[in-house]
């Protein structure tokens, strides 16, 4: 995809070379990391635009710098489009990331030392939901809830017992490796019973909500955060939504000046483009296909004897428990990488292995679905994964990885990215 900016990079061979090789990697490998996707050329163009030159502290119509009339149009468009997508009366599109969005909510609603609850990282939550090494785990009294060992589904009874015992000011739900629908109404009832606010982090499934294949938490929670990449297929960034005007005022102040200075206007421009794309009818089909593909992949692996955490998926991701195969997540990630299948090692609930090793892998469908993969292709991908991992540690390992790599090459050639067919 050569263009003006690529040509300009010829004067910096180090960066130009790295970008070219990364483009080659993305074109020639099947991306199965659940948090990654393939943005459109329009999103790339917006993020690489002159909007990056503009400082714009403040909000549309209320900036601390002159010359903001055009960035105001861009940010207003992003806000309007997000509000339409998620039925939200208030949207802040300035957070630089999902972690920044979550931090802004905590700054808005909590004081240091306050108690809040979040799904534990070990159960599929996110670092920012109270993991000890993070700001959320150090500045606040973070009480973690988990999943049942019997089925790896959220233990709502445990959540309720802990909420009654600790009286949190905020209950957070959502996660980074939880493949099932969450009972938002049950958590809302628990939060109401103890006087807590409810926050949903929909970073992973925002695109599914936008596409109408997942319940909309904005209708239930006091406040919702998300990233704009992953299933939403936009640039890397964050966003906060609510229909509670009291919360909205606190959030705006928490984002700026509380947590951030100038917003990244080139990224907000790209967010606006991606949100516009998500309003189109074909995005709804894309969302449906992500879920159908994830279920096809889960079924293909189950047929080959692989254990899928929780028994399946309702979303774009699956978590594979490799213990019965005697393979670590680390070794699986490396072997699949050699075969051109990019994924990440991931802890499973009640994982006996350390985080740098893990007993599982996380697989997602957003990027390959953007390439055009459907169920048939994901059935093939599931077979390739099983072939590689079944042979791992045997004398057939190298040959299976080579064969898988050839199949990956053929699939990528049939479904190219950033070409005339994209």
From Swiss-Prot:
Residues annotated to bind (6S)-5,6,7,8-tetrahydrofolate: 121, 125-127
InterPro entries to which the protein is assigned, alphabetical: PyrdxlP-dep_Trfase, PyrdxlP-dep_Trfase_major, PyrdxlP-dep_Trfase_small, Ser_HO-MeTrfase, Ser_HO-MeTrfase-like, Ser_HO-MeTrfase_PLP_BS, SHMT-like_dom
Cofactor: pyridoxal 5'-phosphate
Gene Ontology terms: cellular component: cytosol
N6-(pyridoxal phosphate)lysine PTM positions: 230
Gene: glyA2
Subcellular location: Cytoplasm
Species per Swiss-Prot/TrEMBL record: Rhizobium meliloti (strain 1021) (Ensifer meliloti)
GO biological process: glycine biosynthetic process from serine; tetrahydrofolate interconversion
Spans traversing the lipid bilayer: none
Biological role stated in the UniProt entry: Catalyzes the reversible interconversion of serine and glycine with tetrahydrofolate (THF) serving as the one-carbon carrier. This reaction serves as the major source of one-carbon groups required for the biosynthesis of purines, thymidylate, methionine, and other important biomolecules. Also exhibits THF-independent aldolase activity toward beta-hydroxyamino acids, producing glycine and aldehydes, via a retro-aldol mechanism.
Pfam family, one: SHMT
Keyword Cytoplasm: yes
Site feature Plays an important role in substrate specificity, where: 229
Complex and partners: Homodimer.
Its EC number(s): 2.1.2.1
Catalytically driven reaction(s): (6R)-5,10-methylene-5,6,7,8-tetrahydrofolate + glycine + H2O = (6S)-5,6,7,8-tetrahydrofolate + L-serine
Family note: Belongs to the SHMT family.
Protein name: Serine hydroxymethyltransferase 2
CDD domains with a match to the protein in the record: SHMT (cd00378)
Any GO molecular function: glycine hydroxymethyltransferase activity
Pathway of action: One-carbon metabolism; tetrahydrofolate interconversion; Amino-acid biosynthesis; glycine biosynthesis; glycine from L-serine: step 1/1
UniProt keyword terms in alphabetical order: Amino-acid biosynthesis, Cytoplasm, One-carbon metabolism, Plasmid, Pyridoxal phosphate, Transferase
């Amino acid at each position: 995809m050569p263009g003006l900016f690529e040509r300009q990079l010829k004067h910096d061979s180090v960066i130009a070379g790295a970008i070219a090789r990364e483009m080659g990697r993305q074109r020639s490998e099947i991306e199965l990391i659940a948090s990654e996707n393939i943005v459109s050329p329009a999103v790339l163009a917006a993020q690489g635009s002159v909007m990056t030159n503009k400082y714009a502290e403040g909000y549309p119509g209320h900036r601390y710098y002159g010359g903001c009339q055009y960035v105001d149009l861009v940010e207003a468009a992003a806000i309007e489009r997000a509000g339409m997508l998620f039925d939200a009366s208030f949207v802040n599109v300035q957070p630089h990331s999902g972690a920044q969005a979550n931090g802004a909510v905590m700054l808005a609603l909590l004081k240091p030392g306050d108690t809040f609850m979040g799904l534990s990282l070990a159960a599929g939550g996110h670092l920012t939901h109270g993991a000890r090494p993070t700001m959320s785990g150090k500045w606040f009294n973070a009480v973690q809830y988990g999943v049942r060992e019997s089925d790896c589904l959220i233990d709502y009874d445990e959540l309720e017992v802990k909420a009654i015992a600790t009286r949190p000011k905020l209950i957070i739900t959502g996660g980074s490796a939880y493949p099932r629908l969450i009972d938002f109404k049950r958590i809302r009832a628990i939060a109401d019973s103890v006087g807590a606010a409810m926050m949903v982090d929909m970073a992973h499934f925002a695109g599914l909500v936008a596409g109408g294949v997942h319940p909309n938490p904005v209708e239930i929670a006091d406040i919702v955060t998300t990233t704009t990449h992953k299933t939403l297929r936009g640039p890397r960034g964050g966003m906060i939504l609510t229909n509670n005007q009291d919360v909205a005022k606190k959030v705006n102040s928490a984002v700026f000046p509380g947590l951030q200075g100038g917003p990244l206007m080139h990224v907000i421009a790209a967010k606006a483009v991606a949100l516009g794309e998500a309003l189109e009818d074909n995005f709804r089909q894309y969302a449906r296909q992500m879920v159908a593909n994830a279920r096809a992949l889960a079924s293909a692996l189950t047929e080959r004897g692989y254990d899928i955490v929780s028994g399946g998926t309702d979303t774009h991701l699956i978590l594979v428990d490799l213990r019965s195969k005697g393979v670590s997540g680390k070794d699986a990630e490396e072997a699949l990488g050699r075969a051109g299948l990019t994924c990440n090692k991931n802890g499973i609930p009640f994982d006996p292995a350390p985080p740098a090793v893990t007993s599982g892998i996380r697989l997602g469908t957003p990027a390959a679905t953007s390439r055009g993969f459907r169920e048939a292709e994901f059935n093939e991908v599931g077979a390739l994964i099983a072939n590689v991992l079944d042979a791992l540690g045997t004398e057939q390992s190298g040959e299976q990885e080579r064969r898988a790599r050839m199949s990956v090459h053929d699939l990528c050639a049939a479904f190219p990215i950033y070409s005339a067919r994209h």
